[in-house]
Amino acid sequence: DALVLAYSQAVLVAAAGNDGRPNEPLCRGAPMYPANHAWVLGVMARTEFPNAKGDYLAGFSNWDCKTSNGNEYELMAPGAAVWSTLPGDSYSAWSGTSMAAPVVAGIAALARTRWPDKTTYSSRFIMGQVGATGGNLKAITPLKGPAVSYPQADAYNALTSTPSPELSFEELWLFDEVAQGDGNDGDGRVDSGETVELAIVIRNRWGKADNVVATLSTP
């Protein structure tokens, strides 16, 4: 509840963690909170240069198992061998998602300075400017199949890109209860002769979208 209240007034940023694991039980992982909340920008760590396989995801970084499903780490930021200050007037290069998250927090602060009106430009708008404008970089995870890609932080693009809708399908519920039609059997499947109702969740990751039209098709 505290985070939800804070989200209404501020952009929330959190480190994804350094266990090298995915964020969902679906992938035999476990989420890191608060980074995995939908109203928090969860930050993974990337390397400065790709390895021989073209992978930018830091090996220690937790990673997103299934993107655009509402529970996720949104983007990568530099988090490997990042120079920072230490007590005693010294410097050292440290690695971790805790080094990457401040990069994103700084970009979010710049974006809020660029768009200060919170009524017109909500926290979700700033999250979109930061998380959807940097382009994607290749990431190789332990999952079988092709490599994935994650958005990266880019301060210049976050401050200069024109917002546009970025819609994705998130979730679907199907209802075929007997009360909805004489031919319904309530088994949760679409059978011949049934009258069904669908509840579809579409997520907009970035700019404002008006008069959205969805088309349902079958193979």
Functional labels for PLM-detected ranges:
Residues 1, 39-42, 53-56, 113-186:
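C-terminal subdomain of the subtilisin-like protease fold in secreted/lumenal serine endopeptidases
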Residues 9, 32-113:
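Extracellular S/T/G-rich loop segment that most often corresponds to the catalytic His/Ser-adjacent loop
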Residues 13-17, 43-44:
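Active-site neighborhood of phospho(di)ester-bond hydrolases with catalytic His/Asp-centered motifs
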Residues 22-34:
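Distinct, well-ordered alpha-helical segments
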Residues 186-190, 202-204:
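Outer-membrane beta-barrel proteins
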Residues 192-199:
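Short, solvent-exposed loop/turn segments enriched in Ser/Thr/Gly
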Residues 201-219:
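Short acidic, flexible loop segments centered on an aromatic residue
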